[in-house]
Amino acid sequence: MYIRTLIVLCLVTVFVLGGLPVSTTHADTFRPVVRGKRGVVAGGQPLSVEAGLRILQRGGNAVDAGVATILAASVIEFSHFSFGGEVPILIKLKGQKVVVIEGMGQAPMKATREFFVNRAHGGAPSLTTRKGGLIPSTGPLSATVPAVLDACITALDQFGTKTLAEVMEPAIQLADGFPIDELRVQYIRTRSPIFSQWPDAKRVFLPGGEVPKVGDIFVQADLARTLREIVRAERLASKGPRNNRHAGLMAARDYFYRGPIARRIGDYMQANGGLIAAGDFARFAAKVGQPVQADYRGYQVYKAGFWTQGPALVETLNMLEGFDLKKMGHNSPSYIHTLAEALKLALADRDRYYGDPDFVKIPMTELLSKNYAALRRPLIDESRASLAQQPGDPSNMKAVLASAVQTIGRASALPEIERANDTTCVNVVDKDGNLFSATPSGAWLPAVVAGDTGVLMGQRLQSSLTDPNSPNVVAPGKRPRITLTPTLVLKGGEPFMVLSTPGGDNQDQALLQVLLNVIEFGMNPQEAVEAPRFDTQHYVSSFDDHEFLPGSLNVESRVGLKTIEELSLKGHKVKVQGEWGTLSAPTVIIYDPSNGVASAGADPRRSRYAVAW
């Protein structure tokens, strides 16, 4: 009876955590810390995290639950992420090393730099036609190979215990119909002028030609059928006396990437002005790679590699280790200034050096070294904000690259409804202290729906550039450098924390602040995500028309007027964002190996969710 009651209470917590902050449930937070001993799931929507909790209750581990949460989110969080997108994943199983699932699809083989530079008008509709060599922000030309399914299958096969059918069951049920919420209705309404140009997208998201009403049962029948076909392929291959789980998973993968689904998507995209073909699907495989690592004051902070922006957090932590941040005081003018200036330096290196390591040579060891950080640290002027973009010269171990060309500041000219729509997050800790952190993204509204497959196609190719001197220049079969950046932390080699967030280029800025809130200032996970934040846009944007806003600093008003005034006096171009105005919205789970209790925080800025068992 006790266990049944506890489960019910935890499920109720999903919905309690769902609303905007209206009352104080802790001395310093709007929401309570969510704690459990058998497992915790945190993510972006209550039905998504319930899917993961369901798998934990059925004996699955953190990987099984994380994959179930991702797949459920790919159905119901389509405003920010869906099945045709991408998802980098960090995993730490008991007794094993930290690994990263490189869940980022490649550019189509027809996606050459010359194609985008030379075309006057692309095959996309007029609203998404980009001139001047820019890659469209949405439409058929912006898609890379969908990576979600292969990343999930790879994680299950090598680190999970469940079948795809088991972890995909909640997603299929949700595709059959779920009560649509306010956020999804808003995105359908505001993005309909773009996606209505693609008949299948209009058919799916405007049933009967109308925007759904909040609470309507929203059905994705084509997607449900596709998911069932994939599961059927798994079941047929795994039948027999040995009940071969691996064979079933590989059959499911092949059905999507080498079988009828790939052919149908490829045919549709080719017929509608896109570049992706069935052969691009067949060439893709999500690799299991090694993460990069920062050692910061006894904590080991793991990030995905240089095909993401994750190493920028490592660079930033290496620089900040030379400062007494506690003495500065949390969110004091000197604290915010120091973090912002360190981030500017790290992001300048990102823009200058990061890209797909399969295609470009990157001075990885030097960029991540403490010696390089020591060279860069003195560039942080404690009294003045930098307005210059200053990449370093790690190959020659010099603080500044002498030949660096300054990027001209420019604001985005794209209409709001055409801009990138962001991301979600998934974090899981199970009863054994296994850790799972993922940042699912892509294939958000407005998106092309690939015919009768029901699969929304991604827009990540826009993160590639056409500058031939950039390590992130577009090329056939090359991955765009992405902003998606899950985080996994050990303390003295023991499991300690997982955290991830939406927020585009600002993801690592938010995660840095949450991480330091815990490590430097001893905050609990809910305090850490609710504390006032800031971000700078002093970088070349990874999206849209790649704006650059030198010296910009967005600050939530809760830091206080005096702090805002002092930051302005230092030369920051401060924009006050309101009390809860920054773009990011992390979830974080902290694990205590001494008693097996996991504690979660979920950001109220975008109604993140956490549940415990």
Where is each model-derived feature located?
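Noncatalytic scaffold domains of N-terminal-nucleophile
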Residues: 26-50, 54, 62-63, 67-251, ...
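Internal maturation/activation junctions in enzymes
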Residues: 209, 241, 262, 274, ...
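Extended C-terminal subregions enriched in glycine
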Residues: 432, 478, 511-512, 520-581
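Bacterial N-terminal signal peptides
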Residues: 7-19
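Alpha-helical support elements that line or immediately flank enzyme active sites
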Residues: 55-56, 150-158, 251-258, 263, ...
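Short loop/turn motifs at secondary-structure junctions and domain boundaries
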Residues: 284-285, 416-421, 479-480
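Active-site rim segments in enzyme catalytic domains, especially the processed small/beta chain
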Residues: 76-82, 88-102, 107, 116, ...
